[in-house]
Amino acid sequence: MKFGKKLRFECVSEWHNKYISYGKLKKYLRYLYRSDLKQIGEAEEAHLLINGFPSLSDSQEQFKQLSNSSSPIFNDGSCLENSLDSSIGSNIIQEQSQHQQQAQQQPPQQAQQQPPQQAQQQAQQQAPQAQQQAQQQAQQPEQQQQQDLKESFNDITGYSIDQYEDTSNLDEKTPLISILDQSRPTTTTTTTTTTMNTSAGSGIFKNKKPKQIPTISIPVFSQSERERLFLSKIDEELRKINEFFSNKEKDIILHYNKLTEHCSLILKDRNPSPKVLKNIQKAFGELYKGLTMLENYVNLNYQGFEKILKKYDRLAPMNSSIKLDQMERIKLEKFHSSKSWRNMKEDVELLYCKIFKLDKISIAKKKLAPFSESQSADYHMLKLGFAIGLSIGILAFVIILFTNKSLNQHPDWTRFVSTIPIFRAVGIPILAVWLWGVNVYIWDNARVNYILIFGLDPRTSIDHRRIWKTASFLTAIWLTMFLLFCGTVTGNFALGDVPAQVYPLVLVIFFLSVVFFPFRFFHRKSRTLLFITLGNVIITPFGSTKFRALFLGDLLTSMVKTIFDFEYTACYFFTGDWMINDSTRCNQVNSIALPILSGLPLLWRFMQCILRYRETNNKIHLGNSTKYAVGFSVVLFSALNGNYQAYEPWSASRILWCVCFVLSTLYMYCWDVVVDWGFMWLGKPRPLLRHQLMYKRHMWSYYYVLFSNLILRFAWTLTITRIPFELPINSELFNTITASIELVRRFTWSIFRVENEHICNSIQYHAFDFSEAPWKNEVPKVESPKSLLPLSSSYPYRQDNFNNNNNNNNNNNNNNNNNNNNNNNNNNNNNNNNNNNNNNNNNNNNTNNNINNINNINNNNNNSPSGSNSSINNSFHLGSSSYSYDNQYSIWKKSSKQYYSTSLIDSIKKKFFNNNNSNNNKK
């Protein structure tokens, strides 16, 4: 895989603007070293103007004005005829200049013997000779002359003239820029050339006259200038990467410090609550995810610099390689030389083992891995193909059953119509699973981080293949039950003596068991998260307002018919109507329940918007709540006008209902387009769209959704109201069609809604979420490096320092006043041990919180036994260890807290490795 594609698919999508601009650097190298230039983009031409070089657009405009309109003209303003004439004329001028140079480069003795008059006469004699040679060249045979013209055209332009002999190819974008030899300085001048008369012999262009043409040229740099310009680009990329890396590293350090503090409290508590452990486990996962992303950021940028420098060495002349020197310099840059994030990653693994009582670091790495290692894609695709094939076969039987008149003799349409809502109540959620898989597939291909947006666990989230596999099996079961029911109702076939009304009941029981039973199949963790989110929506004033809860609330507003069908299903089976084949009572109940059930999702979303406004104080949520209030008014007027028939005259309330119907639809459409999708930017380069798009390869989809959403919004309004007009088809079939269309519209809406949310996260470079961490209200946002103060402290032990622990302790005990112990005590409870340390001259009183006094801890020791394995070094500077957090800490960070946190990590490391060594010795 090429590195450009690798960078596009492996980078953190929210940080893509902060990675190395590999594509732009490749274009810039192509500009510096290649003569057959393609069209130079706006960024490259702007760079030329900034550096004081002439722009190509001015020369092209002059060339268009002077070129003949009857000649074949290319898109960049150049003319084929003029280019050929200029090439031939330039060849003649070069020959003349060569003769003059030969005349001037004669031996010095002859030049001294010849008087000036003779030298001038000799030069005048050589000039006609050059003209005679040009005439002889013009009198060559026609085929040879055409071949010479083609060769001269190819040498200058880099393009073959054969592709231009056909006039159909003249409309293609083939720029023609005359470029001077790289060994000479270039100038943009207008020269008069003496061209040969092509009407005599050339079969390509006839009756062409010599004319004054401009020579378009671009700057040709020397090797030193090329190297200087390229290295300036490299320096710009390094500054961008180092600045972003520093900010993200500081942000991770803040959360790392808070994590160690809370872990120390958990270790003190012998029986922490499950909720605390769950929250701290999520915090561990997010911190490890951030460290993994930072590692990915460093590795990809380093590979990018290595690749682009390799390309530079390939294009540059011999003996001008800069790759080795520059890579040594890049290794010393902050983003690559920093060891803080590497050491933190090791410490997080050890701390996770201690908190959750794991024996091996490999187990902790597996649990902390940000992405799960699922089964192979081929395995899931095999199951998916089997289930889809089974579903297609059953669907074919259903179609034959309804289309073949010889089979459909005596159908029981009353029973069939009464059970349509039951099959629809199960079928619409299955369709939603299919559409969710389509959305996940689109987001994955477009690199939209939906996992972060919905707050999912990347270790347990399921991809589109597994979603489609589950949906295909559910579809096969649904079609099987529907086929058996239809065969029994029509009297064509039956499964023994089983009555037709049993099949809908079996389908409902199976569906509920799959959804609610806590078995380890059908993605139990995903189902659990779905029910938790659904509970938050139902108890909205007291629930969560995360994005997934808001998204599920919007989805429920589109599944009003499904909610209504579940109510009908419960009534149909609990009242016993399915035994007597009578749905009269349930229909009467539905006339009352429909307005209530239709308004519940709108009421939930309305309260969610009010709660969001209370939390964020953002007035845009009030506008969103108004949207749902208007929709609720449509439901209210529909309930008041539900008894009207199509032939009855229109009353004032009915007219008001229609007005609310239209206004609510238009209001919701405008809100979808402007706020939820972020469209309607009136300007270039994309009218009616936003500046940044994630689905650029399918630009038509944006304009399609702008049009289709307006039409399908009216279909949604029909799903929450009664239909006060007659229909040419059965009402249950019409409800099924409108419910399916509305569900498709909602999931189409979600594709662009999540895209807009992802772009908002990308603007803030928000790639990991600590919103559920125990310290979510304690850590300030890292806006700029100015909010951080330097703290001269080094990072504690690495794993390779444990074998030399005694040597490190001896190096740190040079300033003791009384005792030379091999180990130090690095606890935050130094004041509690003052009564037992009478020989230390009150060394343990250094528990002040001043940042500048942290280093004084290196001079203090306790009277612990010198050979104790459980002793902990209290020094931050451990011998030759130079692993530091780059001396950057937050202003709110207390020195005593950091002192305790590092001692906690040290103690965990020492105990962990001592236990491992003892186990190895026993073996």
From Swiss-Prot:
* Signal sequence interval, chain numbering: none
Composition bias, Low complexity: 94-147, 186-195
Q: Which domain of life is it from?
A: Eukaryota
Database matches in InterPro entries:
EXS_C (IPR004342), SPX_dom (IPR004331)
Keywords in alphabetical order: Membrane, Transmembrane, Transmembrane helix
Q: Where in the cell is it found?
A: Membrane
Under PROSITE patterns, the record lists: EXS (PS51380), SPX (PS51382)
According to the record, the segments passing through the membrane are 382-402, 416-436, 471-491, 499-519, 529-551, 591-611, 620-640, 655-675, 700-720
Q: Does the keyword Transmembrane apply?
A: yes
Asked if the keyword Transmembrane helix belongs to this entry, the reply reads yes
Cellular component (GO) terms are: membrane; trans-Golgi network
What the entry lists under CDD domains is as follows: SPX
Q: Where is each SPX domain found? A: 1-326
- Membrane topology classification: Multi-pass membrane protein
* One protein family per Pfam: SPX
Where does it mainly reside?
Answer: membrane
> For the region Disordered, what residue ranges are annotated?
94-150, 185-208, 793-871
The text of the family note is:
Belongs to the SYG1 (TC 2.A.94) family.
- PANTHER family in the cross-refs: PROTEIN ERD1 HOMOLOG 2, XENOTROPIC AND POLYTROPIC RETROVIRUS RECEPTOR 1-RELATED
Designated name of the protein = SPX and EXS domain-containing protein 1
